[in-house]
Amino acid sequence: MLLLDNMNHEELHPLRHSLAHLLGATVVKLYPGSKLTIGPSVDNGFYYDIDTSTKITENDLEHIEQEMRSMLKSWSTFSHKEVSADEAREFFKGNEYKTELINELAEKGEKISLYTSGDFTDLC
């Protein structure tokens, strides 16, 4: 069990970012066809912007949380891989939001990293 009260921002950031990835993976599983945009850690938690044709309401949040808890059991590690912009574009083909982000990273000369946990891979 983690004691979050004693963790500082630098310690909480990777945990929150990982949970944002888990949220994205969960929504994609529960609502097929959803397109993930970005999912950062923020000062008071995390979020994930998601384009979905399904209207997700407050009533859906408990089900999403339960599925996140279930999926978390298979998320024991993350693997990291740096890829070229072309490889990233191919991986995220069909997601215009990821393509836009990849293009922005490539234009700035920044590294493009993919992180995988379970069967979910995302930009990071």
Label for each model-derived stretch:
Residues 1-14, 26, 35-38, 47-124:
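Auxiliary tRNA-acceptor-end handling modules of aminoacyl-tRNA synthetases
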Residues 18:
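TRNA-recognition modules of translation machinery and tRNA-sensing kinases, especially anticodon-binding
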Residues 29:
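Metal-associated gating/positioning segment near the N- to mid-region
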Residues 40-42:
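Structural signature of FAD isoalloxazine-binding scaffolds in flavoprotein oxidoreductases
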